[in-house]
Design a protein with these regions (language model features):
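Compositionally biased terminal segments of proteins
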Residues: 1-168
Length: 168
């Protein structure tokens, strides 16, 4: 069983519109990197966000922020969090576990852009929507974190390798 499999299966069952980003996406694209959290970029419709929040709560996840998690489904509240609280992601965690899910609410790559060239990667018998290398690099460029700088270098190497394989 892959980490987060229960959530990912439920997302699939409920037809949640999302794309995997962050460290797990880096792993799925071909780099070895230690990470325990899963970042997702989701379609920001109220209905889709309500599905995500409901699934995470049912699976035992809690919010780190001292706010009602259903607020993420309200566009006015989301905008307040982004502009007044400088929030970029909404974090859910599972007690006594390293598992965390970050719903990205502010990104240089929109869900629509990510979905346009999403990669579908099959792991076992589940197909995962994963952000493209180019879009993931765009997301990681302005974070200022050293891990993201390393990820960008790895992603560029993977892209170059894949382009080289396409020449054959």
């Amino acid at each position: 069983m892959i980490i987060y499999e229960e959530i990912l299966r439920e997302f699939q069952k409920q037809k949640v519109k999302y794309v995997i980003v962050g460290g797990i996406a880096v792993n799925l694209l071909g780099s070895l990197r230690s990470t325990a959290d899963m970042g997702i970029l989701v379609q920001m419709s109220d209905g889709n966000l309500k599905k995500v929040v409901t699934i995470l709560k049912k699976k035992g996840y809690h919010v780190k922020q001292p706010v009602n998690p259903m607020g993420i489904a309200d566009e006015k509240i989301r905008r307040d969090w982004i502009y007044n609280k400088h929030m970029k992601a909404f974090n859910f965690y599972k007690e006594n576990s390293l598992e965390e899910v970050d719903i990205i609410i502010e990104s240089p790559v929109s869900f629509r852009q990510a979905e346009a060239d999403v990669l579908r990667i099959k792991i076992g018998n589940i197909v995962l929507p994963v952000i493209s290398i180019d879009n993931l690099i765009k997301m990681k460029k302005n974070t200022g974190r050293s891990i993201d700088k390393l990820d960008i270098e790895e992603l560029k190497k993977i892209k170059k390798l894949k382009e080289g394989l396409n020449d054959f």
